Amino acid sequence: MRQQPLQWHPAFQAAMQIELAEYQDWLKYEREHNLTQNPLQIDLLIIKMEQGRQIEKSIGRLFRRYNIIEYKGPSDYLSINDFYKVCGYAFFYKADTVTEDEIPIEEITISLVSRAYPRKMLRHLREFWKCRVKKMEEGIYYVTGSKIPIQVIV
């Protein structure tokens, strides 16, 4: 008969509550907190199947092997929260593999597509993340200074 694996999380959570007991009046503990109500879904994932091939179209020049695209429809806009959500998708996509480092982080790009220039989001990236935003051509902006190459397409 196969043994059930020992559940260590409840013991760890109890130990944390004991350790922080003097602060219990203003701490809230949420065990196994769900990050989303809906399934995580990347709007579009473009995988380059042939290494070393370069896309000449301006929209795909930044592409590496795994390219995560976030699209905002005509009545929506790219927000600061969208930036963090898509970065989270990229990191989760990288980590959700069978073997460690199966998807190298340097093989991932992010493209954020919107009808309008995301002024507030890009200001946040410049000021908080110290990224640089460079207009590559009409409607295509590269964000540099991040671990993952990012382009904004408007």
Q: What do the predicted segments below correspond to?
A:
Residues 1-154:
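Conserved single-residue anchors adjacent to enzymatic active/cofactor-binding motifs
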